[in-house]
A protein has these predicted regions:
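Surface-exposed molecular-recognition determinants
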Residues: 14-15, 22-358
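Sec-dependent, cleavable N-terminal signal peptides
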Residues: 1-2
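N-terminal glycine-rich anion-binding loops that anchor highly charged ligand groups
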Residues: 11
Length: 358
């Protein structure tokens, strides 16, 4: 069977990184653990969210659920009190929004994570945190610009940045707003860390569902899962004929979804008032991996990367799809469905896995 890797994601496979993250062992010869290092949830409005880490780890993962209301925010990520809204020139970044030409800034005071937006956002970042090297950041975020409506597709940003400081590790992660709005009560930043030399600890990611088909079907259903604020999903489609993966939450097939996606680095396509999130890049075998912000009382935002096999064999390059999806329903997700929109079937070997934490 051809092995598929997701586009613009760390290497993940059925028994790979997600299995590692949800594992119960540690150490160089065993499984690694992404552990929670710290979090901050606002209880009022603020221009800054800062998280002090319980310990420094060489690999960091940052998840953000931001609530902003009707006024714009424009975030800058910075580390160890170096930067924020000025006073530092130790950062450089590149950001691309909605398929437009990327912009760059050098010798500045923080990493641009958002561009100006309002309402709600879900974001995640991976950061290398080695003392002897500049700290490199890669992140993806999705913004919901129309609260309560599926008639507007989410916007998105791709961010890469660096903090040039060497000789120490990141021990504080923060973001500050330089626009007119504020981060509202309920906004949250969570920082996870991984050290391959750890031998004890508990993974923050809990397996919520693991479903593998044994026959033909048009749906892979997680069944009821525990209500968690942060969800990480992975699916593989073993296709017979023209079968393609799309997504629903809580078996809701009403027109409550909207999607922004870009295939193979092309321009963005948007879909509004749909009965599913449009994940498929091509019909046929495909592998997808992504994160969902499942914040209570907020619309649900998905960031997904899918790789499609295309024609089997090394003579054809795989297809890549990046997806930003939204459900306008604010009820929390307690089940996930991968649904087929083609004339073929999902067949035996197709699977869906879900992890989560609060």
């Amino acid at each position: 069977m051809n092995k598929l890797l997701p586009f613009n994601m760390p290497p993940i496979s059925k028994g790979g990184m997600l299995g590692m993250l949800a594992g119960a062992g540690g150490g160089a010869g065993g499984l690694g653990l992404y552990q929670e290092l710290g979090r901050t949830a606002l209880t009022g409005t603020s221009d800054t969210i800062s998280v002090s880490l319980s310990t420094a780890k060489p690999y960091l993962m940052v998840l953000c659920n931001y609530i902003t209301g009707s006024s714009n925010v424009d975030g800058r990520m910075f580390f160890n009190s170096d930067g924020g809204s000025g006073g530092s020139s130790n950062y450089a970044w590149r950001i691309e929004r909605d398929g437009n030409t990327a912009s760059t800034t050098t010798s500045t005071y923080g990493i641009n994570t958002e561009e100006s937006y309002f309402n709600n956002a879900f974001q995640y970042y991976f950061i290398n945190n080695f003392s002897d090297y500049e700290k490199l950041v890669t992140g993806i975020n999705g913004h919901d610009l129309s609260s309560g409506a599926a008639s507007v597709a989410p916007t998105r940003c791709l961010t890469v940045g660096k903090w040039i400081t060497t000789g120490s590790q990141i021990t504080t992660v923060a973001t500050t707003n330089i626009d007119s709005g504020d981060y509202a009560s309920g906004s949250e930043m969570v920082v996870l860390g991984y050290d391959p030399t750890d031998t004890v600890g508990t993974s923050i990611w809990e397996e919520l569902a693991s479903v593998e088909l044994t026959g033909a079907s048009d749906t892979i259903d997680s069944g009821t899962i525990a209500n968690k604020k942060y969800l990480w999903i992975e699916y593989f489609i073993n296709a017979s004929g023209s079968a393609g993966a799309n997504m629903r939450f809580n078996s809701n097939s009403s027109s409550v979804y909207s999607t922004r996606r870009t295939a193979n680095g092309g321009s963005d396509d948007t879909y509004v008032n749909q009965d599913k999130i449009e994940c498929r890049v091509e019909y046929g075998n495909a592998f997808g991996s992504g994160f969902i912000g499942n914040n209570d009382g907020q619309q649900k935002l998905l960031i997904l990367n899918e790789t499609a096999q295309s024609t089997a064999g090394a003579g054809t390059a795989p297809a890549a799809n990046q997806v930003w999806g939204k459900s306008s329903v604010t009820t929390n997700i307690t089940s996930i469905q991968i649904v087929n929109d083609g004339g073929g079937d999902f067949v035996a070997g197709s699977y869906l896995k879900v992890w989560g934490f609060n």
